[in-house]
Amino acid sequence: MTDNGDTRMAGQDQAPSAQPGSGPAALAKTCNKFDAPMPTDLANALSHENDDSYSEERTAKRPRMDHPAGSNDVSNGQKASENNSNSQHADENGNENGEAPPAGTNGTVDRRAGLAPIKKEYIIEVSTNRNSKSDNVDDDAAEGRGGNAGDARDSREDRDGGPRGKKGKKEKRRKGQNTERSFGNSRDAIQLCNSRALYSEFSPHECKYGDKCRMSHDVRKYLEEGRRGDVEAFGGKCPVFEQYGTCFSGWKCRFVRSHMKEVEHEDGRKELVLIDKSNEKKFAGEDGTKGVKVSGGDGTDERRPGIYNNVDMSIKIELNRKRVDFTKADEYIKWMNDEANINNEFHQRRKDQSTESIDDIRARYVDPPFKPSEKRRLYFGPETPALAPLTTQGNLPFRRLCVELGCELTYSEMAMSMPLLQGTKADWTLLRAHESEVSPPAFKPSKTNFVYDDYDHSRDIRFGAQISGNQPWIVTKAADALNRFCPNLRLIDLNCGCPIDMVFKSGGGSALLEAQGKLERMIRGMNAMSGEIPITAKIRTGVKSSRPTAPSVIGKLAFGSREHRERLGAPGCAAITLHGRSREQRYTKRADWSYIGECAALIKAYNEQKDALTDTAAEPDPSTLPNSKDGRIYFLGNGDCYSHIEYQEHVEKARVDTVMIGRGALIKPWLFEEIGKAQYLDKSATERLTYIEKFVRYGLDVWGSDEVGVGLTRRFLLEWLSFAHRYIPIGLLEYLPPSLNDRPPAYVGRNELETLMASGNYKDWIKITEMYLGPVHPGFEFQPKHRSNAYEAEG
């Protein structure tokens, strides 16, 4: 198939390709198409297209994925693909190369469990020694932050690194992992003061630090000596300026030559000025006013257009200094603590205690100081595939790309509750959302698929926040803060499944699965203080594989403990998401969708028995009910969804309301598009490159086009490429559906660009970023989750 930028659907005829590669000329043409300069080292590399040793080095470093061997893998894959009757055989049956592979056809194919079934003509032979360097992939990088507490931060100052600590004995066993990652720094040689960054050279604007300021105030000197040259990608034009008519990075922009000029005054002086076209009609608002404004003059990224849930720095300072009034939350927390103490006293009573003393204990129970507000109604259904909360990977530019490709529900990266209460900028920044995420999901309510009369689609949005905490009082106050300072939230999700040691050992994440009384109090407290924002929870099957606890956890979340059920009603959990693995399993086993189906049946039974399990003497208070019709709970499944076939099977067979997708979206974000169209889409390498270009544009939009913003965009693009390179084009597969956990052998793509994008070699990832962001900064470092792919600046 020629790489002409067209999407190939399953069963669609494609042009034959005699050779897997199409030569360096095709890649050069691709770079020119997107105004991306051809990096020197990439040009040199492509000149070796006939050099077998180079091809082996670039394509052999494919990651191994943890996957249990067994005959089940083949039969399940074949059975799931029998429904795809439109697929055609593209090899032995005489069809052209590059066509969609057959569905479930095995024939004489040498199928090895855990190995992707790539067609023989694309597989290359590599030495055993070279293969041995490829280690197993640790996909926990996408689920929770690792040993670096400063990692996974969507802020410019705080995301570049974190505190380093000593390794414990258990950490030493995980020798292949970068548990304490550092990303170097991307700074200008001369730091230009923010008081000058957005103003013309002769502007009278004064620096608030006066003579004590350590930064430069000389714009000309900064441009000549203090910064690297302009990036040549995008034709040298600033993507932010092209979008808004002004650039929020000012003189610090790596594309500043495209929006600056020198003017000569009457007295002969020449002044450097920034161009501002935001008043022009195409950039103006609907009312004719100026479309965008640069806030404050301090170069901050807190007020970028199209970004919501921006929390003012003054509020963060007040939180840090403990000046925010949490009187109402404190009142509810005191009641919860008293309630817990009475419960402990009641359950620990002596057998010889008299009935009178037991009655005295019961008499001390009091009602909550106030009732929760009625919640905004939610809807989860087959039309609303959801993107899972992904630490580091689920940043705003990536979520924006997924929404553009058909994702209907998104979640923030996991924010820690205590840092939120301390006003930590990094955690509050995680809650920012793009304007596409705060619009209603793109489905139309109808009588056939929509029966909830009190659901207001116009008030619904796509974006929800996920938080983690280990104490009821912490998450209760965090929910209060989110309700007050982040108005654009669909829901607040409590993480009860994070397997990372740092979270688990502190009593949060999956540790809550074995502290169900505390978990119930956390949900009640959050529900009481979240205003109209619904509360949801994400759980795992359990901590230990041998001791699944999901059914009992679901019971507590749905109806509360027996001693509270009649008096207080349900805790108020609107939806539950179950990840079909235990904490112990991590990603070493497939997600257990049969178990998810059993829990879904349990939820259905609970919903049917709701009236019998709640107080029959009086109608339940609407504020105590979960956020759906008649107080019924939504149930989402999560784990290993990698095709529209699997998505449909999970909805129909496991009977979940919808599926939450994590790694599958990281590897191919257009999975949401496939789900919407109910067909496989064979994206060409050129099309996939356009998604990378969009990510870069979105990254520069949110993080800035200065040196720091370019460095952050490059880092998070590399984080994404560490997953995206594992995509195997369906035209290269023997049969469908593809398996998320299959490890691909070393192979060559249908052209040079496809081969480059399939490489597990970090040097090739760097080359891809250089197409749009220019050469890396001398101080830049990249350390992915596994050391085998680490990158450091070479000097």
Task: Mark where each language-model region is.
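Cys/His Zn-binding finger modules involved in RNA regulation
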Residues: 2-321
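Alpha/beta enzyme core
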Residues: 480-506, 516-631
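Hydrophobic faces of well-ordered beta-strands that scaffold small-molecule active sites
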Residues: 385-389, 410-412, 463-467, 492-494, ...
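Active-site beta->alpha loop and helix N-cap motifs at the rims of alpha/beta catalytic domains
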Residues: 313-316, 321-361, 435-529, 533-534, ...
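Glycine-rich phosphate-binding active-site loops on the catalytic face of alpha/beta enzymes
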Residues: 258-266, 413-419, 496-499, 570-582, ...
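Glycine-rich, positively charged N-terminal anion/phosphate-binding segment
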Residues: 359-376, 392-481, 751-753
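Catalytic cores of alpha/beta
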Residues: 396-400, 472-486, 544-556, 613-661, ...
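C-terminal helical cap(s) of enzyme catalytic domains, especially alpha/beta-barrels
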Residues: 425, 432, 586-588, 595, ...
